[in-house]
Amino acid sequence: MAADTHQRGAAKTARNPVKIDLEQSGQLLRKPSWIRVRSSNSQKYLEVKRLLRENRLHTVCEEASCPNIGECFGRGTATFMILGDLCTRRCPFCDVAHGRPHAPDPDEPMHLANSIAVLKLNYVVITSVDRDDLRDGGAQHFADCIRAIRTQSPQTRIEILVPDFRGRLEVALEKLSACPPDVMNHNLETVPRLYKQCRPGADYMHSLQLLKDFKAAFPHIPTKSGLMLGLGETDEEIIEVMRDLRAHQVDMLTVGQYLQPSKGHHPVMRYVSPEDFKTFERIATNLGFSHAACGPMVRSSYHADQQAHEAGIE
């Protein structure tokens, strides 16, 4: 595979152990009235896009076709995606392209820090593709980016949304310990029964261990995770995952509706009503999460600054 090959949709998931039923995927559920995406062509939206291109930066907002991109860019916020735009995994719910990535760009931390300083952002989220090709999974690059941002914008709070560092957990946590974030986020995405189908290459217990080990090393730093509904899970399974997260000392939670990027992706199995999301939010609060954001359009980094503020991060 060429280094610049971008595989998406059916081409990306063709080699997955559990195949997507494209016939079922073609029978799309009608989107309910509460699923509404706001478009934006505001000056701030255009300014953010221009600055990203000038600095050769990627955002998960664009690469994953996030439905909230117009609102977030319009507010002058973005979730920056480091380590390129090619992922070594083939998750069928995700619209980020699969391929053989290039080597990490040594100038990316500086470009990222420059952009954040120009935009005068108070809170940023840094995420990445999975980099199974790197010995540390990309952890050193995360630390370099955090350090560069703090050098130029010491008041900016930094949340990182990391891959699972599977097979590299110990070395990854060692790298991050040199320059830890203000919030540590790693998404479980779905329930353990659906991992082989929805997260090929990942392991549910490993992801929980990542969150627990980070919390053990940095008890004062909030940990966070996110789930998508509509992949085939049951309500009872979601509640059980919430319990697992609390048992592994996770502080914050996001739960949102899965939206199918294309017919080549995993189909939407159900649309969860706003009322049911509110029920999940009440359950999460009762389980002891310091903050839980649950709603159809909630994403792990959507209004992350507000979530962090409500959880006590200034």
Swiss-Prot record:
GO terms for cellular component: cytoplasm. It is an enzyme of class 2 (transferase). Its cofactor is [4Fe-4S] cluster. Binds 2 [4Fe-4S] clusters per subunit. One cluster is coordinated with 3 cysteines and an exchangeable S-adenosyl-L-methionine. PROSITE patterns: RADICAL_SAM (PS51918). Keywords: 4Fe-4S, Cytoplasm, Iron, Iron-sulfur, Metal-binding, S-adenosyl-L-methionine, Transferase. Its EC number is 2.8.1.8. [4Fe-4S] cluster 2 binds at C87, C91, C94. Pathway: Protein modification; protein lipoylation via endogenous pathway; protein N(6)-(lipoyl)lysine from octanoyl-[acyl-carrier-protein]: step 2/2. The keyword Transferase applies. SMART domains: Elp3 (SM00729). Its main location: cytoplasm. It is found in: Cytoplasm. Residues 73-290 form the Radical SAM core domain. One of its GO terms (molecular function) is 4 iron, 4 sulfur cluster binding. Pfam families: LIAS_N, Radical_SAM. It catalyses: [[Fe-S] cluster scaffold protein carrying a second [4Fe-4S](2+) cluster] + N(6)-octanoyl-L-lysyl-[protein] + 2 oxidized [2Fe-2S]-[ferredoxin] + 2 S-adenosyl-L-methionine + 4 H(+) = [[Fe-S] cluster scaffold protein] + N(6)-[(R)-dihydrolipoyl]-L-lysyl-[protein] + 4 Fe(3+) + 2 hydrogen sulfide + 2 5'-deoxyadenosine + 2 L-methionine + 2 reduced [2Fe-2S]-[ferredoxin]. CDD domains: Radical_SAM. [4Fe-4S] cluster 1 binds at C61, C66, C72, S301. Belongs to the radical SAM superfamily. Lipoyl synthase family. This is Lipoyl synthase.
